[in-house]
Each structure stands twice: as structure tokens, then as C-alpha cells.
């Protein structure tokens, strides 16, 4: 069974360590999304892998036993979770889950959304603002750049009230606003 306090690995490293095409594509993702290391990409890949395997499992259950209540409940749970995070549209099917990409997962990270909303000048600065406690979601300080933001929480992302960036006259905030304009 194992010791319950032991942390388990949240990602799986690539089978081929020095595959040139994979390294180049990961480098582009790391630069685009301001990631600290490749492990963050592998973690997002693992999240995607879990959702896709769940979708394949539901499709297999549907083809073998039909539309049983257990199958319907599992499908609704899986689709509902992905819709809540904005990875699927409101009229999505199981096939849409299989077509998701790593970029879709990375787009829902707090770091990316802070940059896309114009609260930071770059993805790296967005990461710094989050880790230093300048960003809040619905008034609650969040200091995890990899936090998956749901659709409901997205509108509540702003500077933390008591942060130095919470003041409109802050010099760095003025530079961020000028760059956005």
C-alpha cells in the first residue's frame, strides 16, 4: 500500500531523453508560457494524459456495456470538470477531450492568464508577481503560478488589495498599463 505521507511524482519524464524535435518544441512552450523548467511541461502533459485516458475509458465502457448509469455519471463528471476550467465548450463531446493539446492546459494556468489580461508585461513577470503575492483571485491571495483557473474565477483576477501594485500611482503598474495601451 505504501506510506500515505509520501509524495508521489506528479509527472513522467520522456522515454527518449535527447529527442531533438521534442526538446525544441518544449523549448518553444517554455519561452511562450514563461515556464521555469521542462518539468512544468511534463506535469501539464500528465494532467492531459489523465483526462484523455479517462475519456478513452468512458468510450470503451460505452461500447462494451452501453449507456449504463455508471458510464453516464463518469462521462458527465469528466466533461463537467473540463468545462469548468474552460478546456471544453458547453456543447462538447467525448471526442473533443481526445483532441485537447498541452497548450490548452498551459493556457488555463494563473501565470498565463495574468499575462493575457495585461496585469504583467511578460509571462516571466507574471510569474514573479504571483510568487511575490501581488495577485489575488476574488480577493484571496494566490502565490502558485501553476494554479488552474476556472472560468468562474477568471473575472476575479486582479492585484492584491494591500499589495504595492494595488495602488494606481505605483510606477511599475504605470509601466505595465502603458505597455498594454
Swiss-Prot record:
Keywords: Ribonucleoprotein, Ribosomal protein, RNA-binding, rRNA-binding. GO terms for cellular component: small ribosomal subunit. Residues 108-180 form the S4 RNA-binding domain. SUPFAM superfamilies: Alpha-L RNA-binding motif. The lineage of its organism: Archaea, Methanobacteriati, Methanobacteriota, Stenosarchaea group, Methanomicrobia. One of the primary rRNA binding proteins, it binds directly to 16S rRNA where it nucleates assembly of the body of the 30S subunit. Part of the 30S ribosomal subunit. Contacts protein S5. The interaction surface between S4 and S5 is involved in control of translational fidelity. It comes from Methanocorpusculum labreanum (strain ATCC 43576 / DSM 4855 / Z). This is Small ribosomal subunit protein uS4. GO terms for biological process: ribosomal small subunit biogenesis; translation. GO terms for molecular function: rRNA binding; structural constituent of ribosome. Belongs to the universal ribosomal protein uS4 family.
Amino acid at each position: 500500500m505504501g506510506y500515505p505521507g509520501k509524495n508521489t511524482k506528479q509527472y513522467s519524464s520522456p522515454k527518449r531523453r535527447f529527442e531533438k524535435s521534442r526538446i525544441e518544441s518544449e523549448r518553444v512552450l517554455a519561452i511562450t508560457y514563461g515556464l521555469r523548467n521542462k518539468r512544468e511541461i511534463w506535469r501539464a502533459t500528465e494532467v492531459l494524459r489523465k483526462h484523455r485516458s479517462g475519456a478513452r475509458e468512458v468510450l470503451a465502457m460505452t461500447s462494451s456495456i452501453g449507456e449504463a448509469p455508471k458510464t453516464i455519471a463518469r462521462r458527465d463528471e469528466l466533461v463537467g470538470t473540463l468545462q469548468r476550467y474552460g478546456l471544453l465548450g458547453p456543447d462538447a463531446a467525448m471526442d473533443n477531450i481526445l483532441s485537447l493539446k498541452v497548450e490548452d492546459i498551459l493556457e488555463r494556468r494563473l501565470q498565463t492568464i495574468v499575462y493575457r489580461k495585461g496585469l504583467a508585461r511578460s509571462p516571466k513577470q507574471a510569474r514573479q508577481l504571483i510568487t511575490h503575492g501581488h495577485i489575488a483571485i476574488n480577493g484571496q491571495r494566490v502565490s502558485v503560478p501553476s494554479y488552474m483557473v476556472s472560468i468562474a474565477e477568471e473575472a476575479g483576477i486582479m492585484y492584491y488589495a494591500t499589495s504595492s501594485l494595488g495602488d494606481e500611482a505605483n510606477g511599475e503598474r504605470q509601466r505595465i498599463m502603458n505597455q498594454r495601451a
